[in-house]
């Protein structure tokens, strides 16, 4: 039975593209083995907070993941500093950290009374073994001590060293018209007393709801003032408003909510069937409370975290014929908001629908159906779900600084702006 269960899990995960031959040139949240699931990196103890801590503060970064086996694995981690674009920084370990940089993970527990066996591993940073000295971007690499060069997982976090203030706003007025499908972001960077920088020393990254496909990188200021920089580029700072995220809550097997049609048990797993997705083009904007793509792993019908189970979640998007000019993805925080094989839907000609099955740990999830045109890297919701300028979105702004002759990129400001502020 155990072999059968592992075989089913492996089939799902291999279908999702978990076998990756090499690390990406730019580090990102990525898993390279089907034995790891539910990887999370967040601030302190709040799963909904982005993993960005302030330097020399009491904050910690929490790293947690499941190893889909009850057998103990000798897993460890190492940490590397990265440039603003998540490429490896040209630094020695002693430049950015004190302590040991290959640390065995000693905090773990095994699952109990679950249909999927797993061992949860977790740790926090900084800790007694690792002290981080510089601001900027970092990547955590997980590996087995028996094969230290074979990376099993990479996850990213940042340390902020505030040196600026930032003010911004989101408007429904864009180059596409007033109150259309789009939102326009405008913001101003104000230098703190005692700090100044020229625009060439700064790198700015803007994300919408922590998505990567439509992020804006390395944008230049529109206006340069004595103590501030204004960013108002009408071309680059336009984003689809999109729609509010759909929600799933299967933290309880019998009292579920959101877009769940039913939960059933087919030996040996629970299956969550999601209501079919559909385009809502032409439909007016409808407000709904969401958490902008985030997830929270939890369960209401268990006694401890070790009893939180997994379910196979089935997404469908009916279409009479497949779209040959692109692909449909299910996006959300559960896969880091990336567009890759792990969340790409497959067209079923017999059922006339796109389908995707994901092995997800029980809890609450936000998701959307995103269309990626062939040959593009930027997805769109206009075709799959619709878009409205009124939609509540969060915009994350990262400001990096490297002075002329400097040897690393500091994160001198991180700000999050809501479109409804």
Where are these regions (language model features)?
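Short acidic/polar inter-strand loop motif in beta-rich domains
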Residues: 84-86, 130, 144-152, 211, ...
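Contiguous beta-strand segments within globular domains
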Residues: 33-81, 178-189, 300-315
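Basic K/R-rich, polyanion-interacting modules in nucleoproteins and related proteins
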Residues: 274-324, 411-421
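Short, compositionally biased P/S/T/A/G/V-rich stretches that sit at domain boundaries
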Residues: 20-55, 161-176, 289-302
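Bacterial Sec-dependent N-terminal signal peptides
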Residues: 1-25
